[in-house]
Amino acid sequence: MGSVRKASAWLGLVDDNNDDERYYDDDYSEGPESGDAWVTDPRVKVASDVAEEKGRRIATVTPDSFRDARAIGELFRDGVPVIVNLTAMEGTDAKRVVDFAAGLIFGLRGSIERVSTRVFLLSPADTQVISGESAAHRSDGFFNQS
C-alpha cells in the first residue's frame, strides 16, 4: 500500500482494505519442486569449454589486397593464431599487411614468426609455439631480417 493511500485510510477518506490479503502463502510450497529436472540444451556450452576450444583453432588467411587485413585483425583479436599467406599479393600491399600484423602483435602482446617466404604466423600472447629447428639454425627473430 502506498504512503498516500495509507494516509488517506488513516484520515478515513478511503476504505482501509488490506490489499496484502489477496496473496496467499498456500499457493507456494516450501522445499524442492517436484517434476522433471531441467535439461541444458546440448548446443549450449560452458564458458570454460569454449575457452579450451579456442586454443585448438588456427586460421589461415590468404589476402588478395590490404582490405583483407581486417579479417586478420579480427581473428587475432579474438585470440586465434593466424597464418598469413602473402604469396598472392603484390609486394607493396604485402608490406602494408606485414606492417599491420606487426602493429597487431605489438598492441596485443603477441608474436610473429616467419614460416616461409611471404608466410607468417601471428600468435596471441597466450599461445606457445614449439619450433622443430635447433637453436643454432634459429635466427634472431622476425625483426632482425637485415
From Swiss-Prot:
Q: Does the keyword Mitochondrion apply?
A: no
Tell me the Gene Ontology biological-process terms attached to this UniProt entry: division septum assembly; FtsZ-dependent cytokinesis
Origin superkingdom: Bacteria
* Location of the protein in the cell: Cytoplasm
Q: Which UniProt keywords apply?
A: Cell cycle, Cell division, Cytoplasm, Septation
Chain segments carrying region Disordered: 16-37
Q: What is its main location?
A: cytoplasm
Biased-composition ranges, Acidic residues, are: 16-30
Keyword Cytoplasm in record: yes
An example Gene Ontology CC term for this record: cytoplasm
Q: Could you describe the subunit structure of this protein?
A: Homodimer. Interacts with FtsZ.
Which family is this protein grouped under? Answer: Belongs to the SepF family.
Name the job this protein performs: Cell division protein that is part of the divisome complex and is recruited early to the Z-ring. Probably stimulates Z-ring formation, perhaps through the cross-linking of FtsZ protofilaments. Its function overlaps with FtsA.
> Would you tell me the protein name for this molecule?
Cell division protein SepF 1
Gene field? sepF1
